[in-house]
Curated annotation (Swiss-Prot):
It is an enzyme of class 2 (transferase). The lineage of its organism: Bacteria, Pseudomonadati, Pseudomonadota, Gammaproteobacteria, Thiotrichales. The chain crosses the membrane at residues 14-34, 57-77, 90-110, 117-137, 174-194, 200-220, 238-258. This is Phosphatidylglycerol--prolipoprotein diacylglyceryl transferase. It comes from the Bacteria. Pathway: Protein modification; lipoprotein biosynthesis (diacylglyceryl transfer). The gene is lgt. Keywords: Cell inner membrane, Cell membrane, Membrane, Transferase, Transmembrane, Transmembrane helix.
Length: 268
């Protein structure tokens, strides 16, 4: 059995002000995304955005992630609780962010920003997609430090006892998601971007691979107590929300493949 490290969720306290690791992980992901996107804007001739515009894009994306992630969590996962405890909606440091809500928020942010600068929405998504897994991985580390979103009870050597998960060892599903949704997904997308490839290949890969990784990792993650298993006595809310991403990613990849076969797909 693995040992849970018991990291203090508060990274730094200045008088009454507490700075949580959870928030720092989001800031780290946003900063890394800004840095790499700015770098790519300088070296990629097809970039739909100028280096000096990356800061504004980062601001739009950060708002989309925070607002969309929080609103998505409230709507998708715990609406009755927040309906009766509305003040808790603003306690982001206690956790409670939805990737799928954040993804919708980012799509809205992309649409608004693309319209502002006169860029193509899909080109912008293709350009930014390779750096998104960094933020996803950082967020999962924040979940792990918070001791939340732990996995199912297990007798596997990979199990560990979480402070809020009861006395039995559980899968560290946050670390599984960090590895597959963060490290592996970033590595695959970044390697694909090194060489010329069909336009929108990376966008399709991101949506398809993230959806698959999340769907699989959900089998190790403890279902949300307010929902449990929704369909077939095994399908969770996270899996249901991942299916549209898998399907849309597959549609994009098939379209790219067909255009490539017909030599109608531009390489970038």
């Amino acid at each position: 059995m693995l040992q849970y490290p018991h990291i203090n969720p508060v990274a730094l306290q200045l008088g009454p002000i507490k700075i949580h690791w959870y928030g720092l992980m989001y800031l780290l992901g946003i900063f890394a995304g800004w840095y790499l996107t700015r770098y790519r804007a300088k070296v990629k001739p097809w970039a739909p955005i100028k280096p000096e515009q990356v800061g504004d894009l980062t601001f739009y994306v950060a708002l989309g992630v925070i607002l969309g992630g929080r609103i998505g969590y409230i709507i998708f996962y715990n609406l009755p609780y927040y309906f009766h405890n509305p003040s808790q909606m603003f306690f982001l440091w206690d956790g409670g962010m939805s990737f799928h809500g954040g993804f919708i928020g980012v799509l809205i942010a992309f649409a608004l920003f693309a319209r502002k600068i006169g860029a193509n929405f899909f080109d912008l998504g293709e350009f930014v997609a390779p750096v998104i897994p960094i933020g996803l991985g950082a967020g999962r580390i924040g979940n792990f430090i918070n001791g939340e979103l732990w996995g199912k009870v297990t007798d596997s050597p990979l199990g560990m006892v979480f402070p809020t998960g009861g006395p039995l060892p559980r899968y560290p599903s946050q670390l599984f998601e960090f590895f597959f949704e963060g490290v592996v997904l970033f590595s695959v997308l970044w390697l694909v971007t090194i060489k010329k490839r069909p336009r929108y290949l990376v966008l399709g890969l991101f949506m398809f691979l993230y959806g698959c990784a999340r769907f699989i990792c959900e089998f190790f993650r403890q279902p949300d107590p307010q929902y449990g298993y929704i369909f077939f006595n095994w399908m969770t809310m996270g899996q249901i929300l991942s299916i549209p991403m898998i399907l849309l990613g597959a549609v994009i990849l098939i379209a790219v493949f067909i255009k490539t076969r017909k030599n109608k797909c531009e390489n970038i």
